Amino acid sequence: MSRSTPLKKVRNIGIAAHIDAGKTTTSERILFFTGMSHKIGEVHDGAATMDWMEQEKERGITITSAATTCFWKDHQINLIDTPGHVDFTIEVERSMRVLDGAVAVFCSVGGVQPQSETVWRQANKYGVPRIVFVNKMDRIGANFYNVEDQIRNRLKANPVPLQIPIGAEDNFKGVIDLVTMKALVWEDDTKPTDYVEKEIPAELKEKAEEYRTKMIEAVSETSDELMEKYLGGEELSLEEIKTGIKAGCLSLSIVPMLCGTAFKNKGVQPLLDAVVAYLPAPDEVANIKGEYEDGTEVSVKSTDDGEFAGLAFKIMTDPFVGQLTFVRVYRGCLESGSYAYNSTKDKKERIGRLLKMHSNKREEIKVLYAGEIGAVVGLKDTLTGDTLASEKDKVILERMDFPDPVISVAVEPKTKADQEKMSIALNKLAQEDPSFRVSTDEESGQTIISGMGELHLEIIVDRMLREFKVEAEVGQPQVAYRETIRKTVEQEYKYAKQSGGRGQYGHVFLRLEPLEPGSGYEFVNDIKGGVIPKEYIPAVDKGVQEALQNGVLAGYPVEDVKVTVYDGSYHEVDSSEMAFKLAASMGFKEGARKAGAVILEPMMKVEVETPEDYMGDVIGDLNKRRGQVNSMDERGGNKIITAFCPLAEMFGYSTDLRSQTQGRATYSMEFDHYDEVPKNVADEIIKKRNG
């Protein structure tokens, strides 16, 4: 069976945006204009086709990235919906891995907002080419040129408008296409229609010329050939301009900008044309890196030939077909009814049915080809980030990094009978979302759930009720504290026991040194002359690692330490791995007590947007919460306050902020780094922990 769409004509794109930039509406209109969904879902009524989970409908925010296939001008576009809320950055990271290009949607009034910066950073990290769509041009205060400045100054990118708006706010009529120098006008506001090409209005001729010159300059810098032609005063042909824009877009040296209003159906068709013209096909992006079990690196080229290799990037539970695993095929093809090899887990998986998803309908298919995205039904052991490959070529594609959770709460089912249902539900949800963890508190026996923020955990509890019919009581949020040391110390420890027959003997000298924040744990073997035989060294490492689980101050995990074993002794008969493990563990604990141990807490980057009248109250309140105000800006007549605040002080912040500002301020918060807790607060934490 051969493929219906050639690889060159496949586009895997995501629509990434800040929470209210109109991302879902833009996705909806794309699906509408590509002829897949006939009634446009409006987010305001909570009926968008992409937002297929109940809570999203209520909250009006998009949570899970669903992959949807649609067609435009004989190209297959796989649309991966990415969430716009900070607590779901893991979802964004995950979709960035499998995208080849992105459409960044900005609100023409709000411009570059904090979440847009986070999403932009992630797109830079994965080298994703993108085009910008400035949406909501019909809103009061719409300003295309402001957004252009913000992209340049805040995101440090090089925006190149390919269109400029005709009018703004209520007078927004359409756009001037700077490539063809034609005005594209939408004459009917109420229903989706095609645009009409007209001559450029006289009052905009000069501005259009100025912006076209800027565009041509940017394009000419993408190759020596075009530069020579441009400097020689020759006109660039239409084809050359388009090739130059694409080259600049793929090398991330330029970001093409378009504008419109998705809600009023203006500007969507030219956006689709730009996706097809300027965003990359799967074989136009860098090959994905992989490695074999022995560590040899390999580069995996996107092609139908060669052994199958794909990445499972998302797991969802579907009420009708059970568990769906979304897979992006990088090489070869995947057939339903065949077998694939999970090279991350070393397990064989049977491929059941294969589905191409439309946001809420599904089409059964026989084969997924290179560059395509689809869902597999019935995989047993495959989790997010696992590689599926052929048994003949067990490549492991580069793994995804998932952040550690920063907040935990205890959950208990309302009725004892629900205990088992609750653990099944939580395990299913943890499979879907690698940034969500479930554990049991050893002392109290309570079930603890941990995640990236309050909203993240609220939604988990909500999904337990809706999807699994388990009602849960939720405890007080707990912060994920850590411990570390501040001084370098050397510590000797001898573990020797003699109780009839064979004794136990382990003797180590350890050096404990503080590392830079975020470095984790480093172990160094500096034993000379075999004073400790090398078969015992792993036991020393293991002993230290066990001691790291419970710090000496309040029993929190210890991080950012380097431990060197540099001397010691052993006994021919009595030494054992166990003895060295215990010596290292106790030696580390003793050393840590002298090494200036401190408690660390997660610091959140908080951005509050508030009318000026309330600014004093907001800053005063942040200071009360031990926050450090970092910067103050203005945006659209409001004040923007950026601060670092300890997570421990931020519980219930949304309610407090609402009452301080009569509901007129908004905020966003994401984890930034760990920082030392002030002594008085640390004493309280220790007292509480140690009873």
Swiss-Prot record:
GO terms for cellular component: cytoplasm. GTP binds at residues 17-24, 81-85, 135-138. Residues 8-283 form the tr-type G domain. It holds the Pfam family EFG_C. Catalyzes the GTP-dependent ribosomal translocation step during translation elongation. During this step, the ribosome changes from the pre-translocational (PRE) to the post-translocational (POST) state as the newly formed A-site-bound peptidyl-tRNA and P-site-bound deacylated tRNA move to the P and E sites, respectively. Catalyzes the coordinated movement of the two tRNA molecules, the mRNA and conformational changes in the ribosome. PANTHER family: RIBOSOME-RELEASING FACTOR 2, MITOCHONDRIAL, TRANSLATION ELONGATION FACTOR G-RELATED. This is Elongation factor G. It comes from Campylobacter jejuni subsp. jejuni serotype O:2 (strain ATCC 700819 / NCTC 11168).
